[in-house]
Amino acid sequence: MQNSESIIKNIKNSSYLIDKEFLVWPENAFIGDKNIELIEKWNLKSYIKERKNFFSDDSVKKEYEEIHKKFNEEAISSYHVIISNLEEIYENCKRNKKIYYQDIMPTVKKVIEFYKKQKKIFIKYFRIPKLSANYHIIHSVNTAILTVALGNEMGLNNYKTVELCSIALLHKIGFLFIPSKISEKKEALTEEELEIIKKYPIISYKIASTSNLSRSICLTLLTHKENLDGTGYPKGLTSENISIESNIIGAASAYSAIILDKAYKKSFNSGASIIELIKDADKKFDKRVLKLIINAISSCPLDFIVELNDNSIAKIVDIDESNPNLPYINYIIKNGKVIDKNEQSSVQSIPNTNTGIKKILNQNEIELIKNKYSLIDII
């Protein structure tokens, strides 16, 4: 049996073809009236159409017991079962150097069922305790759930949704054969180590292509790290040679990475993660795909921190199903003073009043507020 170093060394960058397909997407993505300017530079303004939904969240970063009070016990169990199932799939692949479609189908089904049941709050489960699962496993599960959400926004048929979910679950499979001293390194990678990391899509492709996975799955595993401007890897392809499926997986993976805690990097909250994602959108991601992510994320309750019309800082905590454009907020800073958690009570945000939302805060703005008011965290 070949060891990891041998597998990497023997990889050859052979030529391959990329299939391209048209994408039909709904013209109703929504970020918020005061936040649209953040993505004007990517020429997305003409695509944004207001719809009746908003962002909310009940809790984030609570102690484990508190989280279980807020989150659905059955959903938490289902989420952890998906993680455990994918761990088993990855372990089998590491032993056998192969992966079979029928082996991942039960997990794909569970991911799709999880999304359908938690459609309005699925992002919240990305931030619950993950036990001791491997980062790449958790990242792949979260990417798969988000990919199913994107498929829902696109109105994809079941076959295509299953295919994209399968790719998302497997898109980090190549990391199994990257030496852990490199793949789990907390410090900055050397140039040589970075080049080894960049081979993981090729490893994934080689494993998939020697199994019974479809050509479309194999090629998307190979190219999901390619960027529109040619700065991606492993081949440095440009937009005309990158399939829409690859860009969907790449963008979903990027968002899932931003929102997920790492040993060496603190995660962003859900709202700040969107802003972080769109920073390099013109270089990396298809505008249509970015629009789908904005649409999917803004459709479910989130932990957005916002600035109000009176310059107060608040967190969106609930949504009125009968009037989704009027979310409920808890003040964090009001009249220049920190509001004690025990004194917080939810009020409804009304446009064109003091409680109206001016903008969503990015991570830098959140950090500035934390430092200014000596807050350990904003939750």
UniProtKB/Swiss-Prot annotation:
The protein's matches in Pfam families, at most eight in alphabetical order, are given as: HD_5 (PF13487)
Instruction: State the organism of origin.
Output: Borreliella burgdorferi (strain ATCC 35210 / DSM 4680 / CIP 102532 / B31) (Borrelia burgdorferi)
Family matches, as InterPro entries:
HD/PDEase_dom (IPR003607), HD_GYP_dom (IPR037522)
Alphabetical keyword list: c-di-GMP, Hydrolase
Q: Which domain of life is it from?
A: Bacteria
Please write the reaction equations for the catalytic activity of this protein: 3',3'-c-di-GMP + 2 H2O = 2 GMP + 2 H(+)
Entry protein name = Cyclic di-GMP phosphodiesterase PdeB
Cofactor section? Mn(2+)
Gene Ontology MF terms in the entry: hydrolase activity
Could you say what a knockout of this gene produces?
Answer: Mutant cells exhibit a significantly increased flex rate. Deletion does not significantly affect virulence in needle-inoculated mice, but mutants display a reduced ability to survive in ticks and they are unable to complete the mouse-tick-mouse infection cycle.
Every HD-GYP domain range: 114-310
Q: What does this protein do?
A: Phosphodiesterase (PDE) that catalyzes the hydrolysis of cyclic diguanylate (c-di-GMP) to GMP.
UniProt-listed SUPFAM superfamilies: HD-domain/PDEase-like
| Gene coding for it | PdeB
Q: What is its EC number?
A: 3.1.4.-
